[in-house]
Amino acid sequence: MEPILLRASEESKNQRLDAFLASSLDGLTRSQATRLIESGEVAVNGRAVSKSYKLAGGEDVAVTLPEPEPVEAVPQDIPLDVVYEDADVIVVNKPSGMVVHPAPGHPDGTLVNALLYHCVGTLSGIGGALRPGIVHRIDRDTSGLIIAAKNDAAHQYLSAQLADHTLARTYECIVVGKLREDRGTVDAPIARHPTDRKRMAVVAGGREAVTHWEVIARYPGYTHVRCRLETGRTHQIRVHMAYIGHPILGDTVYGAKKEVPGLTGQCLHAVGLRFLHPRTHEVVELSCPLPDEFTRMLQKIRK
């Protein structure tokens, strides 16, 4: 494979090379980064270095990745929290930490693996072999409602609603700091970060991205917020809240790098979903409670 070229930013100064690679390349763990360095597949400014090499900032880093192993989505008996199900759609409350579909680095244990087992071959094929039935996605460390289609007609009908912004998705989150206004809208385009492939960013010329938010409650140093997506870009709420100076609590990518004790992901939960049913054309409105980690964190910041 052709080497991937990365530029170490000034923010990467004093960061170990293996940690830099793990944070810059999708699906790459720190141990995998270490093996690449030790096998000579990584060069900094054209020369091989050790895994403990600390970046000065500004270096050119070339990484040659091995050919990815083929990934196949197979049914797995993984428990699902099914919120709604009929012959056309299934809506699941996904736990934080679960990846939506298989990919290199996450070949199994995903929501798709669980859906294949639960639905026994009745998922739409429009999303392809690795994403059967998947109409939209939510991040691995985000919990909450996600809808999947059981046939192609349902998939097309739901995808059309997603495209014209009539499939409504509501989230709740805890953000760092106190939002001054009671409500607002972030209208800022999002694209891949220019130097960090694992991150998205507000970038001029990026894809349109609109998030509407309103304050639920304010606490010392934090705000409980409800967000409604008008568009659905990758990491949209996380990027937009960080962009206005209020990153989501527990988000180590767009907020503080230090993990929050008692929190395994970020405090972001897809709490509500509203759509027109693909067969009856009636409105279906669903909600699910906040996960235990989220409610415990609310109790903690109230004190």
Segments predicted by a language model, with ranges:
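Thr-Gly-centered strand-to-loop micro-motif
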Residues: 44-45, 101-102, 149, 200-202, ...
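Short, well-ordered beta-strand segments enriched in hydrophobic/aromatic residues
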Residues: 90, 225-228
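Short alpha-helix capping/helix-loop boundary micro-motifs
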Residues: 45-51, 221-224, 259
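RNA pseudouridine synthases
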Residues: 1-185, 189-194, 267, 293-301
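Long C-terminal interaction/binding lobes of large macromolecular proteins
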Residues: 213
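Pseudouridine synthases involved in rRNA/tRNA modification
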Residues: 1-32, 80, 195, 204-207, ...
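Conserved "cap/hinge" positions at secondary-structure junctions
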Residues: 46, 65, 239, 257-258
